[in-house]
Amino acid sequence: MVIIRLARGGAKKTPFYSVVVADSRNRRDGRFIERVGFYNPLAKEGQEGLRLNNERIAHWRDNGAQLSDTVARLVKQAQKSA
């Protein structure tokens, strides 16, 4: 099954997440198909904390990809702020 989820990056105690399309059998930070955005939970004021490519997310959802709970929340948040 293909899933759209967060892959953790960044240094210790400073998380940075990539929003990726991956096979659910692969590790969280492992191999992925496509990177469709990023999420920075520690973004300072004036910095971009969330960027999603909604066209590509819609494309993958139409082709059967599932959203993780956190990514679904972020997509809803991005649509509300846009």
UniProtKB/Swiss-Prot annotation:
Signal peptide: none annotated. SUPFAM superfamilies: Ribosomal protein S16. It comes from the Bacteria. This is Small ribosomal subunit protein bS16. Pfam families: Ribosomal_S16 (PF00886). Belongs to the bacterial ribosomal protein bS16 family. The gene is rpsP. Keywords: Ribonucleoprotein, Ribosomal protein. GO terms for biological process: translation. GO terms for cellular component: cytoplasm; small ribosomal subunit. InterPro entries: Ribosomal_bS16 (IPR000307), Ribosomal_bS16_CS (IPR020592), Ribosomal_bS16_dom_sf (IPR023803). PANTHER family: 30S RIBOSOMAL PROTEIN S16, SMALL RIBOSOMAL SUBUNIT PROTEIN BS16M. GO terms for molecular function: structural constituent of ribosome.
